[in-house]
């Protein structure tokens, strides 16, 4: 070949691929981008843009700083990692696979397929290493705040000089969408106030969302916003420069008094020659042609889902993770020798078991509650239950959305964490959504049983976080007071009508509407002993009488429904009621008994538990052919279709319109909630 021909051939040859850190050809990030592209392409749906844009951020964090052990995803002192922008799920699946978790390549090939371990958005319990279910934007960030609160509080409660058994960080990835959601304001404002120095957030500032360039609708000065919250803000980090990222992470780790936001300027879909930086990469496959071009640009000449062993070796965290956990195990053993009682308590709380003292404490509280038979509002009954049970539940970490003295969530021994880092009470401020999503993070972290509180009518603000509690099966307790038109003068803006029925629509959420002090205490017992889902308490503002019961009836409370008062003679009708309307049902039954219509009263504090009973158990409450009249101060639709009764049909007395502003005494008769009106409905049903 002549010199001229050789020069021409050299000019036509592809340029050598730069494989240095930060370059497209860096094998560490090329593997992440390739797996993200391949997974979305094979599924024919998904979001490749964020994983491709955050590859360098992920590489620096996961390879150099994240303390975790792929062989034991539940190691108590692991760092927590949350992908708040959960649509970019192929990023976390690729990270978990490459670092050595039990997530084989076959599962990445089944991305978004039925019964795979790689669902469209990360789901708790589906994939080892996934700390929380994310997808509803902003909530992962709030979960991370909750995890950081739990870490800080647990450390204050259990660490001893020279023996720190709780010492880990919470890292969270988030995007523009997370920051546009209001829950991010609620959670991050509180995080700054609480000085969560072990919380580090990475902001993927790529300027793109589904509709295009976010500058048209999200021009906020995000760094200034977070500085105002009291965060440590690291600005203008090139999200594709490993050296800058490394410096930023080290600066974040050196800040112990404030949470840190690292603002990373990135390009969505980085590496895709014709699509990077464009909204098309956000939520759709790149296509075979674009993927081929991207592979060429990265110098990635491997087949789809193929990763060479030498690149796996660059990612493998099993040895370093095992060493870190081994060091913690040694520290834990020393702690057990020095503080055996505290060590046993620590392990119990992380396991989620109730204390050995709980059963006896509850039994004593139940005996006292039955004997006192106090006439109080059920919100007060809840406070009494808290006070009685709290000494045996040191893992309580609860609070209210600026309504502690209305929801009655304070109790003897409640200490705000702002005054004592080892406390057990959180003043959340008016942040219902943030409060509830933070509580999910506290529950997910382990070591605590969170409870939160607001007015029932404002549960709408918290609803999606409540749904996430149920979806993830987390033991979070929601105290929702001022439950009906019974709160009176505040009017329809504050009088819940549809809310109880709406909450009952959420799968795996136990909704309790107790009638008195005994049912309220039993509801607390049921919620605390339930480990696979949340519970909501619907509580009255007005005082309610305490009903006499025998042991079998008390046991029936936690079954969800039971005969509170049997008819004199064979029942010709059944009145079923909840909460404050049990009192009304009893008064109506008195009128009916006098009129020669024997009427059974069934109290149904938890419809979800009633519906879980066997057909035989349900039939024992509602005999076949006996008319049933349901009474509840809310919408009637759910009662009309109540499953499990053997009645031919149910007549529901409720409120199917909004309330009125007036004294309570004027509202009940206005809406037909009188003994006479209920008795008349039963008479019509009996015929």
Curated annotation (Swiss-Prot):
The keyword Transcription does not apply. SMART domains: Transket_pyr (SM00861). GO terms for biological process: pentose-phosphate shunt. The active site is at 432 (proton donor). It catalyses: D-sedoheptulose 7-phosphate + D-glyceraldehyde 3-phosphate = aldehydo-D-ribose 5-phosphate + D-xylulose 5-phosphate. The record marks 47, 282 as: Important for catalytic activity. InterPro entries: THDP-binding, Transketo_C/PFOR_II, Transketolase-like_C_2, Transketolase-like_Pyr-bd, Transketolase_bac-like, Transketolase_CS, Transketolase_fam, Transketolase_N. Keywords: Magnesium, Metal-binding, Thiamine pyrophosphate, Transferase. It is an enzyme of class 2 (transferase). Thiamine diphosphate binds at residues 87, 135-137, 177, 206, 282, 458. Activity is increased sixfold following autotrophic growth on methanol compared with that of heterotrophically grown cells. Its EC number is 2.2.1.1. GO terms for cellular component: cytosol. Coiled coil: none annotated. The keyword Magnesium applies. Substrate binds at residues 47, 282, 379, 406, 482, 490, 494, 541. Mg(2+) binds at residues 176, 206, 208. Catalyzes the transfer of a two-carbon ketol group from a ketose donor to an aldose acceptor, via a covalent intermediate with the cofactor thiamine pyrophosphate. Belongs to the transketolase family. This is Transketolase 2.
